Structure formats: C-alpha cells, structure tokens
C-alpha cells in the first residue's frame, strides 16, 4: 500500500488513477476472489479499506450508484471504477460526480465489492463474516511522517473483525472498532 500512496502523491492523472485502481481495487478484488473459496464455514475475511472511501464526496447520482452496485454484483462495482477512469481520461471526473482523488474512489470500490461478496456468501449460506474497515491514519511509511495511530493501534479494528465476537455482522464498514457510515 505504501507504493500506492507514493503514486497518489505524484499528482492526479490517468496514469495515477490506473495504477491506484490496479493496486487498491483490482488487486484486492483478485486476492479476495482467490482466497474466498479456501475460507471454511465460520471463517472471516477482512478487507482493509479507508474512510477516504466514504461516499460523502460524491454527487447524489454517483453515491446512489455505489449504494446500488454494493447490493448488486461485482461487475456493477467494476463498471463504476471504469466510469471513473473514463471520466478522468476525458477530464470530466468532477462534472461526472466523482472526487478528484484516485485513492478515495479505489477505496469506495473496495468497500462496495466487499459488501457484494458478503451478500453473495450469505445468500449461499457459507457462514462467513466478510467486512471492510479503516485502520485510521497510521504512522507508517505510507503516511510519510504523518499519522496519529501506532501500527498496533491501527491493527485493532482489523484484528477485532478477524477474531472477536462481532455479533455475526457481515457486509459492513468499520472504523475505530465500531460500525461506521460508508
């Protein structure tokens, strides 16, 4: 992930968007799809997303499209990533309702597909708990000297989701060891 933030700090253009989506959206999606069949009943999957992916930065139309895609299927979420990439290529991402932030859009996509996969696993009766979370702003190389949490503090929410009793909740977004608005 530190590689991705380094890319994002290089500016904002089609190349930055492509590399960011490849890492955060498509990379995480592919890893999730490969690992999911290996997870036994009662297992858990936790995707580390970000509060940067919250939907409050989008037009109502795009926000609703994300919410609908998260209830539909992975191709619907992937189509939103393509729509963002196309809008950036045309220089119209803000007119199209997206923020001018590749990292934020990639993390919104990651949270959305995590919700879809959780919904699908639940329909299949797999007995899995699948959630996305934000570790917070952690003092790592990725934060380039910033960050307010230690790595141990940043790990608290993902570890909680992986190991502790979360009341059977799946398909949610979490931050600071609690369910959070997406």
Language model features: what each stretch is:
Residues 2-18, 41-123, 134, 145:
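Catalytic loop of short-chain dehydrogenase/reductase
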Residues 39-41, 166:
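Short conserved AdoMet
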Residues 22:
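Conserved residues in the N-terminal Rossmann fold of short-chain dehydrogenase/reductase
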Residues 30, 132-140, 144-182:
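C-terminal helical subdomain
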Residues 31-35, 39, 113-114, 161:
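Hydrophobic positions on the long internal alpha-helix
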């Amino acid at each position: 992930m530190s590689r991705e933030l380094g890319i994002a700090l290089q500016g904002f253009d089609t190349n930055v968007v492509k590399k960011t989506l490849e890492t955060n959206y498509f990379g995480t999606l592919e890893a999730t799809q490969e690992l999911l069949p290996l997870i036994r009943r009662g297992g858990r999957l936790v995707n580390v997303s970000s509060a940067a992916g919250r939907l409050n930065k989008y037009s109502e139309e795009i926000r609703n499209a994300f919410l609908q895609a998260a209830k539909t299927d992975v191709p619907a979420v992937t189509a939103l990533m393509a729509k963002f990439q196309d809008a950036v290529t045309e220089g119209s991402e803000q007119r199209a309702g997206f923020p001018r932030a590749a990292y934020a859009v990639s993390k919104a996509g990651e949270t959305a597909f995590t919700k879809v996969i959780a919904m699908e696993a639940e329909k299949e009766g797999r007995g899995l708990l699948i959630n996305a979370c934000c570790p917070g702003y952690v003092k790592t190389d990725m934060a380039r000297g910033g960050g307010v949490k230690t790595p141990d503090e940043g790990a608290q929410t993902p570890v909680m989701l992986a190991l502790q009793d979360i009341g059977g909740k799946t398909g949610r977004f979490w931050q600071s060891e609690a369910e959070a608005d997406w």
